[in-house]
């Protein structure tokens, strides 16, 4: 994976809601191939804000076949990067970006006749709309149902885009809005995505007849939907989900010393080898230890959600707190997320080049 950053110019800024902007980037001719993407992927952005480097990952919300690369950034409380993007960033500015990454997609083919269902909450719509646009354009015989949860109408990101898509594909796209803080005409459209609401949706969606599911949003909603679908005997392989979490916020926090003595971490990246030490009196994950000791390693969310800091564990053992960014087969092959990995042996070796 290319972990370098490249300068992209902000070509256009669209105010999607009072607290969300869409940034459309101009990709230089020499970078077009590098920044080609698959629907559902994300890019990691980097900027210096208040004299400090900040990195965040944002899902691409464009059609992978016809649109310029763009992301939507919803301002969150105390969010350094999101506040900067919503209030300071302007057209013509440049932002550093990594090439697209992520596995939140399924392979499309023009001959497919599939039924897709997506669940999105709030800004979880960002990768979903890319998936919907690209899927309906690529597979003329496939259909899509979107269940989209928001507080109220004014907070619906991509409201106009979704209406345009519904008009373009009236027989192939169904959109079910669910509002938690604004009464709707029908009971189905009021509330939250929970087990009760999913049972109500059973009147419209025949769960076992759907080929692929996509879920994106907060943890509670994702696992509620996933567990519901698995209870309905939906194949786990057909349930794809992407967890959104605040940058630099781990879902769990390590509170125990995992080694009785110092751990020596050998790190290989870009053909170069460096050594990092972790003292048991101050247990630190491999990524943070390397950064604190002057290392230059790839990272973004630091929450175990993206896979930017993924490396191969070549020697020794580690314990990972969470690993949402890894597939089960990757874990079996020895891959780890260094932002979540604490050494449990005195000698550990990780390779970012494999």
Please provide the spans of the model-predicted regions.
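Ligand-binding loop in jelly-roll beta-barrel domains
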Residues: 64-67, 109-114, 343-352
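Ferredoxin-reductase
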Residues: 2-94, 98, 114, 150-152, ...
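FNR/FR-type flavoprotein reductase catalytic core
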Residues: 84-260, 264-266
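Iron-sulfur (Fe-S) cluster-binding segments and ferredoxin-like electron-carrier domains
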Residues: 291-293, 308-354
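A short, compositionally biased
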Residues: 39-41, 256-264, 305-307
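Cysteine-centered iron-sulfur cluster-binding motifs in ferredoxin-type domains/subunits
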Residues: 60, 298-308
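C-terminal accessory/binding modules appended to enzymatic or scaffolding proteins
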Residues: 261-298
């Amino acid at each position: 994976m290319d972990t370098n950053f490249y300068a992209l110019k902000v070509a256009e800024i669209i105010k999607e809601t009072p607290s969300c902007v869409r940034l459309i980037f101009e990709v230089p001719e020499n970078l077009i191939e590098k920044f080609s993407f698959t629907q559902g992927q994300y890019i990691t952005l980097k900027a210096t804000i208040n004299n400090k480097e900040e990195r965040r990952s944002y899902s691409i919300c464009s059609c992978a076949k016809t649109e310029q690369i763009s992301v939507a950034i919803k301002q969150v409380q105390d969010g350094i990067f999101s506040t900067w993007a919503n209030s300071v960033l302007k057209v013509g500015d440049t932002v550093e970006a990594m090439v697209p990454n992520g596995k939140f997609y399924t392979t499309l083919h023009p001959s497919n006749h599939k039924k897709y269902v997506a669940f999105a909450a709030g800004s979880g719509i960002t990768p979903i709309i890319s998936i919907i646009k690209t899927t309906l354009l690529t597979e003329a015989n496939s259909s899509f149902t979107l269940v989209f949860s928001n507080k109220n109408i004014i907070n619906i990101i991509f409201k106009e885009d979704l209406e345009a898509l519904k008009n373009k594909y009236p027989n192939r796209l169904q959109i079910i809005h669910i509002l938690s803080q604004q009464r709707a005409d029908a009971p189905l459209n009021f509330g939250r995505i929970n087990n009760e609401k999913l049972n109500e949706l059973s009147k419209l969606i025949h769960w076992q007849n759907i080929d692929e599911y996509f879920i994106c949003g907060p943890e509670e909603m994702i696992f509620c939907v996933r567990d519901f679908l698995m209870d309905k005997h939906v194949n786990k392989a057909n349930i794809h989900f992407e967890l959104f979490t605040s940058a630099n916020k781990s879902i769990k926090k390590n509170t125990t010393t995992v080694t009785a003595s110092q751990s020596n971490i050998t790190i290989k990246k870009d053909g170069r080898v460096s050594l990092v030490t972790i003292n048991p009196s101050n247990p630190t994950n491999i990524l943070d230890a390397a950064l604190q000791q002057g290392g230059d390693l790839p990272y973004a969310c630091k929450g175990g959600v993206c896979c930017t800091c993924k490396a191969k564990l070549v020697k020794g053992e580690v314990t990972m707190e969470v690993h949402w960014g890894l597939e089960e087969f990757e874990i079996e092959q020895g891959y780890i997320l260094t932002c979540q990995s604490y050494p449990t042996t005195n000698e550990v070796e990780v390779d970012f080049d494999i």
